[in-house]
Amino acid sequence: MASKTVARSGNRTSSLKATSRGVSQSRRPVPPRPRRNRPAERRNQSLLLAAGLTCGQAIRATWLVAAKGAGGAARSIGRARDIEPGHRRDGIALALLGLAVVVAASSWFDAARPIGAWVDAVLRTFIGSAVVVLPLVIAAVAVVLMRTQPNLDTRPRLILGATLIALSFLGLRHLWSGSPETPEVRRGAAGFLGFAIGGPLSDGLTAWIAAPLLFIGALFGLLLLTGTTVREVPEVLRGMFDTGLFQRDYDDQYDAEYRYDDIPGAPPEDFSGCYDGSLVGGGDAEQKVRGWPVTDLAEVSLQDDVPTTPEPAVQAGTAEVHRLTPRSAEEHRTQALDRAIEGSYTLPSMSLLLTGDPPKKCSAANNHMASAIGGVLTQFKVDAAVTGCTRGPTVTRYEVELGPGVKVEKITALQKNIAYAVATESVRMLAPIPGKSAVGIEVPNTDREAVRLADVLTAPSTRRDHHSLVIGLGKDIEGNFISANLAKMPHLLVAGSTGSGKSSFVNSMLVSLLTRSTPEEVRMILIDPKMVELTPYEGIPHLITPIITQPKKAAAALVWLVEEMEQRYQDMQASRVRHIDVFNEKVRSGEITAPLGSQRVYRPYPYILAIVDELADLMMTAPRDVEDAIVRITQKARAAGIHLVLATQRPSVDVVTGLIKTNVPSRLAFATSSLTDSRVILDQAGAEKLIGMGDGLFLPMGASKPVRLQGAFITDEEIHAVVTACKDQAEPEYTEGVTTAKTTGERTDVDPDIGDDMDVFLQAVELVVSSQFGSTSMLQRKLRVGFAKAGRLMDLMETRSIVGPSEGSKAREVLVKADELAATLALIRGGASADGSNED
């Protein structure tokens, strides 16, 4: 009844609702859901579950906060800017060593309880009996971290290779133990990891097939770890046994000492301190022995190659260039020049010169540069890789080998991108490197080293060459010392902007000559228009005349040098010899004597070296006379023993003319300000990319490509010591008439372009003499004439000895005093009237 009553009431209610809504269709009544009362026990369980979930969430949140805080603190410590990457790497290695000690104590000696017992139990659960070798593996990884440089490119390959070897070893250990099933037995075999690797293979393929598969996996991991391909394995094994690699002990014996071996064909030095990851490499020969390919940047050990033969750029028959290996500082001071000196003159001791530090090896900065270059090649999808590195004192040359079908232009077109990647502008490319199938990319070193002149002069090959005109140049990019013979150049053109190292080279050249030659062997003419560069050498016994500072006297000295050359050629022609060396030998032996009735006494001719510190000043003053004299000397003076060294900081076409370039075959270019200057001095680009401070390109006679070198440096104290040693032994014997201008007997009168206006010329003379100021601009202002006419007026006054020669932008020296003005004007008028009588 109750249910029916409820149903009726429900129907009544629904019908009322339908009527009120205006709905004619009746609906089925919805029975109400009965309320069910849950038992008390189930309600308590729900409350407990909710509380547990809440506690779990709270614990999880607390754990995440703690973990993030600890991780952030650890990362902040690891990324601290004041901790260098090398120190962080050492910290990880030391932590691994500590872990190896704990694992060894717990697994070998059952010590370090209670933590040791827990560590041993956990490790045996996962890797089983392999826990015995785990401390050795951890210690080996720590040693590798401490002794190698980090390399992000090789890290994935090394990790994958080591993982494959470890898993394959555990799987084989599981199979060797009979594939145990129970956890207790697996703890004595290969643990859970061995069971997870070897179990499915043995169940699905049987142990006879699973074992070879695991062995192949371990072999592939070994190939990844060493960076070797399968086809290279026979060559690697053959090279190991052929060279006795297993019987030799490669160590860092050259860290503190550097051997000097000038024997042709001697092996290069082994700089084994520049490693990437776990890779080891020495020279090219050692790379072939160990068989690691050089197709990937990460698999290359960047090294200091020390070749034993010159580059093909310096060929036989060209200017003699010696390449030498470094020497220790102790040997410099104990050796003397290996040749006999006639007479009482003694050459200055090499102990007066300072020696340099041992050469630096490649560093982490070089690895970073190589990685940056490789990254640029990868970004632009160029099939090429950095395969080698040669560190010099100033720059490092990275060798890039191209893939099949890749044009060299693709590399050279990326020069600016590479410069951007390595954060420098002075990137020079050498395509290709002489004697190698590779493109060279030369990048400046961040830690450049100084090259001392003493190191170059005391090198074995320099000492074995007893010629008195051998000079020390510096050290090339491969770390070899370079010296050259001026007699074989036979003339040298040096150019470079301010601060490029040109003056340092001139000083090194002069000190080289002073320490290797006597005044009877070499005489010098020093022309210094700057008046300060060559002043320290004033009074040395090798000088023919005092140091020349006036351009007019310099031109006269060059003319005298031409006459001296002609005189020597006449003597050689009369003696039927072709070179001054042969003439001197015959004079010493008595084969050449003066004819009967002649009072002349034949003596050996010394070499004459004329050094012009600034050619531009001479070409501005007397271009025609200077150029004619230089061209005649450079064309003919080689056999006469006369040599020129022309230096300028403005190698423009009006200074270094075509005739001068044609007859001066050897060039030395330091940093220039523009590409045009580089092409003027070298006939090719390159000098504009040099970084200054002695960085130069040496192009000897007969070479097609220049050699990059760091010029030798010498201090003012060393120069003073050597010059003093020379002055104390002899006084200079000057030759008369060297700087005296030759008079032709002709007289230059008033220029016809002036219009024979004597009044203008007389006014100009009166202005200059009365003011004692010989300036062309003053004549322009006072006389209101043009620049050309004022210049001709000044030249006319110079021909009449009223003013001195031009000194560039300075005012000319007035030679006539103010009280002599009247007599000078009368003399000019008298000469003009005499000339004017012939007119009409």
UniProtKB/Swiss-Prot annotation:
One Pfam family recorded for the sequence: FtsK_gamma
GO BP terms, alphabetized: cell division; chromosome segregation
UniProt-listed SMART domains: Ftsk_gamma (SM00843)
Binding site for ATP: 499-504
Biased composition (Polar residues): 1-26
SUPFAM superfamilies: P-loop containing nucleoside triphosphate hydrolases, Winged helix' DNA-binding domain
Tree of life domain: Bacteria
GO cellular component: plasma membrane
Location(s) in or outside the cell: Cell membrane
Broad class of the protein's primary localization: membrane
Cytoplasmic domain ranges by topology: 226-840
Keyword list, A-Z: ATP-binding, Cell cycle, Cell division, Cell membrane, Chromosome partition, DNA-binding, Membrane, Nucleotide-binding, Transmembrane, Transmembrane helix
Membrane topology: Multi-pass membrane protein
The UniProt record lists the keyword Repeat: no
Region feature Disordered, mapped onto this chain: 1-42
Record has Transport as a keyword: no
Domain FtsK: 479-679
GO MF term set: ATP binding; DNA binding
Chain ranges passing through the membrane: 92-112, 126-146, 158-178, 205-225
Comment text on domains: Consists of an N-terminal domain, which is sufficient for the localization to the septal ring and is required for cell division, followed by a linker domain, and a C-terminal domain, which forms the translocation motor involved in chromosome segregation. The C-terminal domain can be further subdivided into alpha, beta and gamma subdomains. The alpha and beta subdomains form the DNA pump, and the gamma subdomain is a regulatory subdomain.
Quaternary structure, from the entry: Homohexamer. Forms a ring that surrounds DNA.
Family listed: Belongs to the FtsK/SpoIIIE/SftA family.
Role, per record: Essential cell division protein that coordinates cell division and chromosome segregation. The N-terminus is involved in assembly of the cell-division machinery. The C-terminus functions as a DNA motor that moves dsDNA in an ATP-dependent manner towards the dif recombination site, which is located within the replication terminus region. Required for activation of the Xer recombinase, allowing activation of chromosome unlinking by recombination.
Designated name of the protein: DNA translocase FtsK
Organism: Mycobacterium leprae (strain TN)
Upper taxonomic lineage: Bacteria, Bacillati, Actinomycetota, Actinomycetes, Mycobacteriales
